Amino acid sequence: MVFFNGRLLALKEDSPPYAMDPVTLETKGIYDFEGQLPSLTFTAHPKFDPATGEMVCFGYEARGDGTPDVCYYSVSPTGQFTEVVWLVAPLPAMIHDFAVTDNWVRDLFSPKRCANSLHRLFSPSYLKCATLNA
């Protein structure tokens, strides 16, 4: 759960955010940032720039289940997407969390893969790290 730009958002890694009423906690529905959300998924652990208030996010399997596509985006405190970056990961993997510095985004691709009709099957050989210049 995050409160951002006047909205309470429930976050789950393999879906878009859901808006909720901050008083009643009633679910209002999918929130796509007024049509700006470029990815089918949204991290459950966005990071916030303490100097600017900007929210840094990503979506893995961003074009659908089992795809290696990852989409990173920055959102201004007023809810405007300021940067969108697409990349293809070395494998379709779950990205549980990430770290952000002034110059870098660091991800750990969890050792899970699609196999035998199982969406996420543990595979230690798939453990990878990726560092991107922010």
What is the meaning of each model-derived region?
Residues 10, 105-107:
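Short hydrophobic-aromatic micro-motifs
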Residues 73, 82, 86, 106, ...:
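Leucine-rich repeat
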Residues 62, 111-133:
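Short, conserved, GDST-rich strand-edge loop motifs in beta-rich repeat architectures
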